[in-house]
Amino acid sequence: MTDYSTLMHSPGSESRHQCLIYNGAPSQKLSLLARALQTKLVEGYRCLYLNSPPMVAGMRSTLASMDSDIAELVKDSLILSSDTVSSGKNFDSGVMLGKLEDLLDKAIKDGYKGLWASGDMTWEFGPSKDFSKLMEYELGLEEIFHRRKELCGICQYHHDTLPRDAMRQSLLIHPTVVINETLKIINPHYLKFKWPTDINTNQKLDKMLAELCKQ
């Protein structure tokens, strides 16, 4: 059973560790993510966007349509990547978390306020689609958010491509849920239940997931 005690007694990650839960075409969320990314660039953060090649191309186009100088941004401030840690192998949460913290350290060393990162969970876990380490990864990520105030970002959970348990877990480990470009809500299920959850809890989580997917 997953133990949240360390996280519950450490300083909160406030709204820096956010979750975007949705269904339908991922391209429909490009504008939302591009606005969030652009805001963080203006605030002085280096930004990382991790997704499939078509989605990375879509992000480039979306940012360009917002009058962002993509060529100049990609040189330093913005990292658009389709690289996966798994590369066909089993997902290694330790390697992924280590790379993320290395990028954060480098951003600070280069004079940025910190690192904003957004990754699609389906893409991050690679073609094997083995999500058995998802909770371990998210708990490790949340621990970094507690420890490193310079880190912020949005985890993307696509209902159409992730198993139900993965979607349920998304509601247990993110303090804030992104609704649209202007609205975010406090997640009422954050660190409230231990995993695996019982039938009654699953029903509560599934109800909220269904409501979020209507947005």
Which role fits each region the language model picked out?
Residues 1-215:
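Non-catalytic regulatory/interaction regions at protein termini and inter-domain linkers
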